[in-house]
Amino acid sequence: MGEFNEYDDIDDFFCNDISPLHDEADEFGSTDIALPSQLYGKGPKPRAGESKALRDRNKESGSGTESEAKGDTLATKRGRSSWRRGASESSRSSSLGSSSPSDSSSGRSLSPVRPAKRKRTDEQQPESEANRFLAEMERDIELSAGPGGGETATGKGGRDTDARVYNVGFISRIEGSRNRRVNVKVTGQKQFATFLAIALAAFSKQHNIRKSLKPKYQADQVKIYREGVEVFKFMTCDSFNIEEPYNASATDIEVYIVPVDEATAFEQEWKRKFEERVRMLSNSSFLEVMDDIEDDNDDFLVNEYEKALVNARSLNETELAVREGTPADESSQLLKIVLLGSDNKKVFIHVRPTTTLLKVAEHYRVAKELPPTVQLSLMFDHEEIDLDDTICNIDIEDGDIIEVVVK
């Protein structure tokens, strides 16, 4: 009996389809079915009534049939294993054969594609460099817009355009720090939005603003004005196109911080004061210079356009006197004097020698926004002076200080 195989049961199940075996006694042949008992070497039980000789003959024929069946079974197994190996080899060969043309065809088809990919990479390289350059520019702008940033940008002639320095004087119109001043030194390319918050924080800290008023000291709750014109927060000091000083010193700029809800009233007030100032220039002999602003540097000069008007007016009067054949009047000379109030705040004005002290007192009343019911008296050299006198009668010189007493 052959060795036991775990796949014999499976083979026994498929062994019903065995090719017919020809017997010499049967010329037509007979189909033998390989039973499991024959494959495992177990013969059928003898039937009753069979003789011993018949059983021996059947046994001999059964052993022959069993050996032939075993041979057929082994041949069938070998055929199947060889067929499986052949099928696997043929499948591998077919797969290799089918892949080789595809590989070759794909290789041929990819050969023009690979240079195209490299070409696209080459085309994208300048674009990435451009994007990198733009990103660096944006980063430089953000750094220059920051509180301590500021990358130098080269202008015409290779000169640094942001090297110009400005002293920005913020004058507050906000409750809690009204008419107070904070100076901020910045470069010309910084936007007002970047250092406005610094000025507001300085006002709040310096004057101990109470908690209920601190919401008014936010950048979105105020507007900026320069000479009555609103300054947008994205603007810079260079946007004003102010002529640079000949010695390249810092340029002084004066702006007002006004609450949003008071902006309209401030514009109307500024317009009224400007019209009054023009009327005073045309009808009187003195010029308003400063407002009631507290500053460490009280000797702050007047606006450039007002000084230009004064100089032009004096020149015209002198030329008119020369044309008429008369000498130029000495009264056309302007003197700069200082009005000092009890609050130690200075108001600068330009007067002529023929200007009366009453007009000087009225100018102080307008500058301080005092009501008409308030009485004013002027003191010079610790003596009260008559308001009907003129500047030349009291021997007031350029730069003298006149004290103002409010009664």
Swiss-Prot record:
Indicate the principal place this protein occupies in or around the cell: cytoplasm
Q: Where is this region: Disordered?
A: 19-130
The residue ranges flagged as biased composition, category Basic and acidic residues, are: 47-60
User: Where found?
Assistant: Cytoplasm; Nucleus
UniProt free text on domains? The 2 SUMO-like regions, although related to ubiquitin domains lack the conserved acceptor Gly residue in position 456.
Whom does it interact with, and what assembly results?
A: Component of a cullin-RING ligase (CRL)-like complex composed of at least the cullin RTT101, a linker protein MMS1, and the potential substrate receptor ESC2.
State the protein's name: Protein ESC2
Q: What is the lineage of its organism?
A: Eukaryota, Fungi, Dikarya, Ascomycota, Saccharomycotina
